[in-house]
């Protein structure tokens, strides 16, 4: 009986440690991933670029994406 309780406690501790590690060290957001709600979560070699979506001159949304540092994107018409 003691062995079963001990085994259960050990398994619970292992699962708790794994969950805590996932929360504290969540993976960074990769290239072109959306970072609107977490602007500081892009991987170390990326930055979070934000864009305003306008409709008839009025902002209706804001979207952010992880992109490469020192890279400028231009609209190709």
Curated annotation (Swiss-Prot):
Signal peptide boundaries: 1-20
Post-translational modification: Contains 4 disulfide bonds.
Record has Secreted as a keyword: yes
Stored InterPro entries: Spider_toxin_CSTX_knottin (IPR019553)
GO CC terms: extracellular region
Prosegment residue ranges: 21-26
Keywords tagged on the record: Disulfide bond, Secreted, Signal, Toxin
A GO MF term: toxin activity
Record family assignment: Belongs to the neurotoxin 19 (CSTX) family. 10 (U11-Lctx) subfamily.
Name of this chain's protein: U11-lycotoxin-Ls1d
Organism: Lycosa singoriensis
């Amino acid at each position: 009986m003691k062995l079963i309780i001990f085994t259960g406690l050990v398994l619970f501790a292992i699962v708790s440690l794994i969950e805590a590690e996932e929360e504290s060290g969540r993976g960074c957001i990769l290239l072109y991933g959306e970072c609107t709600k977490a602007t500081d979560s892009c991987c170390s070699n990326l930055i979070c670029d934000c864009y305003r979506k306008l409709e008839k001159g009025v902002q209706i949304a804001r979207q952010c994406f992880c992109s490469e540092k020192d890279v400028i994107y231009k609209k190709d018409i």
